[in-house]
Structures are given as C-alpha cells and as structure tokens.
C-alpha cells in the first residue's frame, strides 16, 4: 500500500510531505475472509514464529507469499521484523530520512550504522520467488491467450470490487460507470453500416483488460483484488503477470522512487523499437 501511495502521489493524488511513514519488513497479511470469520487470533502465534524465522507465513494472501518486494523503499522509519528471532523483546528501527530521525530525538536506545538489505533478506526473497513460480503454475496462467482469458473471466459476476479496492487505481470516475461506456442501438447500427459487422469483446473481458492496462505500470501485486473477488478468480496472479511484463519492458518498479517519472509520462527516444 505504501508503494501504491507513492504511485498516486506521482499523479498528484497524494503527498509524502505531510505524512510520517513507518513501515516494516513485511511477512504478509491474512486475507479478508479470515477477518470475517474471526479466526485470525488463533493464527497469530504461528505468524510471529514464521516472521522471526524468516519463513513463509502460512494462510496469508497468496500474493504475499509470492511477493519479492517486502522491504519498504520510501518509509521514513523501517521496523525490522523478518528474521528477528527476538521479536517479542526488541526490534531494530532503521531511520531512512531526516523526518524519521527527528521523530526519535530524545528516545533512549542503541544507535549505529547498518544496512537492511542483508544476505538474510536475499534468502527470504529467494523463497518468495520460488513460491511465486509454484503458485503461478498452480493458477495455470503461464500462457494467457484470448481463450485462456475468456475462460478465466467467465466466472466474473461484474461486481467490480477489484477496481474499487485497488490502491493503485487512479481514476476519479471509472469509465465503466459512465454513460460513455454504454453503447446504444444507434452505435451498433452505425458500425454495421460502416464495416458490415460488429466485432467486440464481451463487456466483462473488455472491463478486465482495460483495468489491467490502466494499472499495469503501477500495480504492486498487493492481492486486494483477489481478496474481494466473490468468484475466486486468481486476479492477484493475473495482475502480477501483467504488471511484471509491463514493468520489465519499461524498466520500472512502482513505488520505489518518488522522483522517478511514470513510464506513461516519460519520453524515451526509440523506445520499444523492436516491436514498432
């Protein structure tokens, strides 16, 4: 969510100046379903044990288990949780900005220079990467052609919860909630007269493709879309696959640097020359 907020700030829909950001090395979060069923409490001992050992936390969001970017990039203060075996007694705070340093002035504690990006963090990242490959195979999303997309989204009931909870969604008014997206009989009649046919994707497929296109550069694969999907569509895996492809092509990691321009607003000479 912090990375997604940075993406919104780049679109002037937020500001980092008036907020102190405290984040942690993240072990993941439990899905909304567990909160509704009120059984998270019984999972917490296992959660903190896995966190302290730097292991994957069972029963967390699948997106969290597959997440390689669990270290905050833009936090003023980072709380070290992962692989902290003494987590119940003490932890380490990394002060990343002057704002973060000013907050702890006068607070007792041991201060020293240190780097959070340690070998241990790389080992955790390797575990997450391997889990991502495994979960992607289980989701059967290696090759997303139109047939696979149509089959995958055939369960969609059109609730559009995914766009409503998406922290990277930046539209003030969703296109699909406006009259512009609704074509009347005259539109189809005109198209038939001009071309002799009307070829189009179903509204459901069109909606999901447009949503993926809009947020692909800024998607942080948080998994909230899958969390609220009543049809249990693996939206987290689809968004991750789409986002990684676009971000790799654009050499861009969303939420890492507030000063880095969005790919869609950055001109690069001879960009994508191999496919143009």
Summary of predicted features, one role per range:
Residues 30, 47-48, 69, 73, ...:
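Sequence-level detector for tyrosine residue identity
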Residues 1-149, 153:
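Iron-sulfur-associated redox domains of electron-transfer enzymes in respiratory
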Residues 21-26, 161, 165, 242:
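Generic hydrophobic/packing signal
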Residues 65-68, 94, 157-163, 167, ...:
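Cys/His/Pro-rich metal-binding microdomains
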Residues 1, 162, 234-235:
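Helix N-cap / loop-to-helix initiation motif
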